[in-house]
Amino acid sequence: MKLMVVSGNSGAGKSVALRVLEDLGYYCVDNLPVDLLAQFVESIQHSSQNVAVSVDIRNLPKDPSLLKNTLTELKKSHDVTVIFLDAEDKELIKRYSETRRLHPLSLIGEQCSLEQAVELEKSILCHFKEDADLVLDTTSKSIHDLSETLRSRILGRESKELVMVFESFGFKHGLPTDADYVFDVRFLPNPHWEPTLRPMTGLDKPVADYLEKHAEVIQLKEQIQHFLMTWLPALEKNNRSYLTVAIGCTGGQHRSVYITQQLGEYFKQQGQQVQIRHKTLERH
């Protein structure tokens, strides 16, 4: 029996995650109190069906160490994976404003604004997030995108095959929270300053041709490939189910997109399971 524990910030997509897990054959329990988690797992430990449990801000113990200790003990004798869903504050506020729903911290008596409730919840859950096996930033994801990402990550974990995720981003939009490695490519020649290339992206051939004329672009790409190829066997031996590599430039439109696409295609050719995402392009 596999146990998935799903948590995260309210509005980040926990209900979507549970629906995906249910579709994958998991028996799902929503908002189980933490002090009943160990007892519940013990009661179904001989079941052949995989189980998913969501942990909500409303049923967390006042002592955060209780949840950590409970999960530590469960992992000693069970196959446990903790998934944490996150999103930027402004996106969570937007989602609540659009649905006109009350934040859970407002429902349990906290006298605070929506913005304060989001900030307070993040501070309460920060330690749980640090201990999660899989952290997903859902800021720019539609329900469909989140469902597909969760499905591929969960199936990848179950098959014990390492999934390599390459994502481009713009530093002006902030660092991705789910990255294992971040490479800054802002020092490379910038197509933005070429008027004909400015409206294009790193996926367009004229931009690729421009970048490939510069030796430092090719050198950096090959050095990142070599670094990842060198340490990939060790990462796979460490029982990781995914590896997220983020490439950032200023706006996330040209240089980072090109390098990310090139890396993803290279590792696909090496037979790796690869996902490629362009965070800034997905915003538009």
UniProtKB/Swiss-Prot annotation:
Annotated organism of origin: Aliivibrio salmonicida (strain LFI1238) (Vibrio salmonicida (strain LFI1238))
Origin: domain of life: Bacteria
Transmembrane segment boundaries: none
Similarity section: Belongs to the RapZ-like family.
SUPFAM superfamilies recorded: P-loop containing nucleoside triphosphate hydrolases
Keywords carried by this UniProt record: ATP-binding, GTP-binding, Nucleotide-binding
Record's signal peptide: none
Stated name of the protein: Nucleotide-binding protein VSAL_I0495
Binding site for ATP: 8-15
Function: Displays ATPase and GTPase activities.
Record: residues binding GTP: 56-59
GO molecular function ontology, one term from the record: ATP binding
